[in-house]
UniProtKB/Swiss-Prot annotation:
Residues the entry annotates as binding GTP 1: S53, R56, Q210
Domain of life of the organism encoding this protein: Bacteria
Site (Important for GTP discrimination): Q51
Entry cofactors: Mg(2+)
Organism this protein belongs to: Salmonella paratyphi B (Salmonella enterica subsp. enterica serovar Paratyphi B)
Active site residues according to the UniProt entry: D69, D71, D121
Known role: Cyclic nucleotide synthase (second messenger synthase) of a CBASS antivirus system. CBASS (cyclic oligonucleotide-based antiphage signaling system) provides immunity against bacteriophage. The CD-NTase protein synthesizes cyclic nucleotides in response to infection; these serve as specific second messenger signals. The signals activate a diverse range of effectors, leading to bacterial cell death and thus abortive phage infection. Cyclic nucleotide synthase, synthesizes a tricyclic nucleotide with AMP and GMP moieties, probably 3',3',3'-cyclic AMP-AMP-GMP (3'3'3'-cAAG). Controls the activity of the associated CBASS effector protein.
Gene: cdnD
Family recorded in the similarity comment: Belongs to the CD-NTase family. D02 subfamily.
Protein name: Probable cyclic AMP-AMP-GMP nucleotide synthase
Length: 381
């Protein structure tokens, strides 16, 4: 059975909590305000924005007191042809020493900042374009479409367009219902560049392309795509003893998007379809004991599976073969309790049993139409 009510409850149980959302929004806003008011960097910082699974609404609830991981991109107007990667990152060290003493560490392509309730990953980037193209891109990166700290799930009508604005009422519904994504020609050909201190070179990255693709895919899948990503991530976490460490994070998310058909009718059917498609699509690659390659949505020369070993891919494939048997049986079962027991084999106790009235029918848990607005605290003051 599809057990839609139970899947809704399951998703509520594995999403980040409202206090966790408050933590990362507070941390991001505080960092942005401090950067905007830090005089030595005022002339080079164009904007800061959230990226990663937090922004794309594909993050799951951290376990065992683990802090949420939040990726924050700092867009600068630095000329990457005139400044070395190490020099660019060094410009931000005095800022970090002033506001985050003994809380930050340098990383290969970013700075890690550990706060009481959140882990921030600060990524320094630059706009490589010049002239009028650069001016137009700076306008986009300064727009509310990019600056919003709301996730795709919270802002369902979000579009990558400098004319898009959220509602002034505080609700997660904007006043821009008829605005569509800006044409690809206006922004996609100009990824950001980021410094790699380990290799001492600049590389290309396009977080906006990943966010926009995710939003578009989620709409095409009736809102189920981001939730199926969460479900698979949770399954992977629950079965970590029997699965390889990789793929995880964005490579796993990308594999799911590659396998999921548009028009997803429900979580149960979507999960079975994407697993079956994954297994059939990569059966030949698996038979060779190899692995596929998949181009990044923003920087096509990047293979998102480049760091995934063939051995780990094959072990993951075998894990999905086992999961497919259970998922198909759970979907086919006409007994609500039996179906729930099978889904729980995949997802653990966060997936609830149906009530006395059974499974696929009206009533029971109803997902809220929009997230609750968390109470404010002074945690990031």
């Amino acid at each position: 059975m599809e057990l839609n009510s139970q899947f809704n409850a399951f998703l509520t149980n594995i999403r980040p909590t409202d206090p966790q959302k408050e933590d990362w929004k507070g941390g991001a806003k505080t960092l942005r305000e401090r950067l905007n008011n830090y005089e030595p960097l005022k002339d080079i910082v164009v904007s800061t924005f959230l990226q990663g699974s937090i922004r794309r609404s594909t993050a799951i609830r951290p376990l065992n007191g683990k802090r949420p991981d939040v990726d924050i991109v700092v867009v600068t107007n630095l000329d990457h042809n005139q400044i070395a990667p190490q020099e660019a990152m060094d410009l931000f060290v005095p800022f970090l020493e002033k506001y985050y003493p003994e809380k930050w560490v340098p990383q290969g392509r970013s700075f890690g900042i550990t706060l009481s309730y959140v882990e921030l990953d600060l990524v320094i980037t630059a706009i490589p374009a010049s002239g009028e193209e650069k001016n137009l891109l700076e306008q986009l990166y300064r727009s509310e479409s990019v600056l919003t700290v709301n996730s795709l799930e919270e802002q369902k009508d979000w579009r990558l367009n400098k004319s898009w604005k959220p509602s002034e009422s505080g609700l997660f519904i904007s006043n821009s219902a008829n605005i569509q994504d800006a044409p690809l020609s206006e922004w996609k050909a100009h990824p950001l560049v980021l410094p790699d201190r380990d290799e001492n070179k600049w590389g290309r990255t396009h977080p906006l392309a990943q966010i926009r693709w995710t939003a578009e895919k989620n709409r095409a899948c009736n809102g189920h795509y981001i939730n199926l990503v969460r479900a698979v991530k949770w399954w992977r976490q629950q079965n970590s003893d029997n699965l390889p460490k990789y793929p995880k994070g964005y490579p796993l998310e990308h594999l799911i998007g590659n396998a999921l058909d548009d028009g997803t009718p429900s979580m149960g059917k979507g999960l079975v379809q994407l697993i079956d498609t994954f297994l059939s699509r990569w059966a030949y690659v698996y038979s060779l004991r190899s692995k596929p390659s998949l181009p990044d949505h923003g920087v096509e020369e990047h293979d998102v599976l480049a760091r995934l070993s063939a051995e780990d891919f094959c072990l993951f494939y075998e894990g999905l073969e086992d999961a497919a048997i259970i998922a198909r049986s759970a979907l086919a079962s006409q007994d609500p309790k039996e179906s729930a027991e099978l889904w729980r084999k995949l997802f653990g106790t966060k997936f609830p049993f149906p009530g006395p009235q059974g499974g696929d029918r009206s009533g029971g848990f109803t997902a809220p139409t929009q997230p609750a607005e968390p109470q404010k605290t002074g945690r990031f003051a």
